[in-house]
Amino acid sequence: MLAPVAAILLLCAAAPPATPRPPSFSAGLDMVNVTVTVRDAHGKLVTDLQPDDFIVKEDGRPQVVEVFARAHEPGQDEVLTLDLGMLLDTSTSMLEQLKLSQEAATRFLEAVPRARELITIFFDHEIRVSKYDSENQQGLYDRIHAAKGGGDTALYDAMAVYLSRVEGTSGRKVLVMFTDGDDSRSELMLPEVIQLLRSSRVAVYPICFPSFAPGSTRAVKARAVLQSFADMTGGAIFNPSQSRELAAIYQKILDELGAQYVLGYVSDNQKTDGKLRRLVVDLPNRKDLKVRHRTSYIVKPREEGSAPAR
């Protein structure tokens, strides 16, 4: 799996590399941070929960929560800091939707709160990476609107490039994707991308622009793939059909980012065997609430002198 990823990264060598940041681990112990969104039965975000309200289980075993932070409160900057990634599909299948997608991307950037880092990836059969800080967005707007459509779709490869660039960074990592969900070009296969997502702490928010006949096999499959990315990472999927729907979608994403909790624990399983670990976050005394979070993670085998990624 690593060889295709390395080949993809070579295509993007001209782009400036993201600066690695050490995770917020202490005393040699490895913290697992889980970002959690909580809503009530009416879909309203719940922001007043306390640490004792939560139970975090890994492979069925309760863990001791040592870090608790709310996005709407000051402090805990290291675990709450936002790194934003944006994937913009410019392939042939998106030609009819490209203008709407470009409008969606720029409107989202105008609305998003200040992020520590902003990485934008344009992709068709090629992958083009741009990195801007939040003080220099005009150049990014110009590039978005200058993007031309054409070529096959390397969605999975583009995701792999983004995931590699934020590997090892602390804080919350959010990937917003403007795409129809189809992939016709990638070297990576879907199971490999899923493996990469499980090894990351990236929440995926696909904004899906269907470019195939409604109900067709291709359309159903593409949407199902995007839905799976959102579900497994604790993100959410949106399906706008008109530009007037975009503002409400952005507000939902931004409201969610501003209402999240981060729960951190040191796993009672200190093996670095590369095996999948299942996560469950429960509110035993608030069964009326719905909790969303990443559902699993993989601990990469530890390299000598380094901490494993979680």
Go through each PLM region and give its residues:
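Scaffold/interface architecture of coatomer-like assemblies
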Residues: 14-310
